[in-house]
């Protein structure tokens, strides 16, 4: 009875090992009928009764996904870092030949109105704060050395102090 119990235990142990070891059931067509065969768990079916060892890394889809995400992140970060360190050159605009002429320090009496000049469109009249129409602020000089029109320089606001607050409020 002891030998019989040993044989049954060995048979059950063999069945247990065979059941716990995962196997792949593969098939392929040979003529019109399918042919079945079994591969081990770490092997892939190749088609004609052959089993090929599969790399376990091929089954790790999340590994490949994270690897591709890491590559894309590194490429994107490198692109933005490169753009910040080496900005693209600015588009060159055509150069304008503009020359300024200074007004004479002591103009002839009556040639210029008192008060700061107000710059307007070259084709339209200028208005001073009082409401009087004044001559064009831009004076065209046809004999300019650059061939273009020349205009007086803009007034320098930095050299004069701002008006007092009471005067600004009173003018409004």
From Swiss-Prot:
A GO term for molecular function: enzyme binding
The protein, known as: WW domain binding protein VOPP1
Transmembrane segments: 61-81
Organism: Mus musculus (Mouse)
GO CC terms: cytoplasmic vesicle membrane; late endosome membrane; lysosomal membrane; organelle membrane
Biased composition annotated in UniProt, kind: Pro residues: 151-165
Family, similarity comment: Belongs to the VOPP1/ECOP family.
Name of the gene this protein is made from: Vopp1
Source organism superkingdom: Eukaryota
């Amino acid at each position: 009875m002891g030998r019989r119990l040993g044989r049954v235990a060995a048979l059950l142990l063999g069945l247990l090992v065979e059941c716990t070891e995962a196997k792949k059931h593969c098939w392929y067509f040979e003529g019109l009928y399918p042919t079945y065969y079994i591969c081990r768990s770490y092997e892939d079916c190749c088609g004609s009764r052959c089993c090929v060892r599969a790399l376990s890394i091929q089954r790790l889809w999340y590994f490949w996904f994270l690897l591709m995400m890491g590559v894309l992140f590194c490429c994107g970060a490198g692109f933005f870092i490169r753009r910040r360190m080496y900005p693209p050159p600015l588009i060159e605009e055509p150069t304008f030949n503009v020359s300024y002429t200074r007004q004479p320090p002591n103009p002839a009496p009556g040639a210029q109105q008192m008060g700061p000049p107000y710059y307007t469109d070259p084709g339209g009249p200028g208005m001073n704060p009082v409401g009087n129409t004044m001559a064009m602020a831009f004076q065209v000089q046809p004999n300019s050395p650059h061939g273009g029109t020349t205009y007086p320089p803009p007034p320098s606001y930095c050299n004069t102090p701002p008006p007092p607050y009471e005067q600004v409020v009173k003018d409004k």
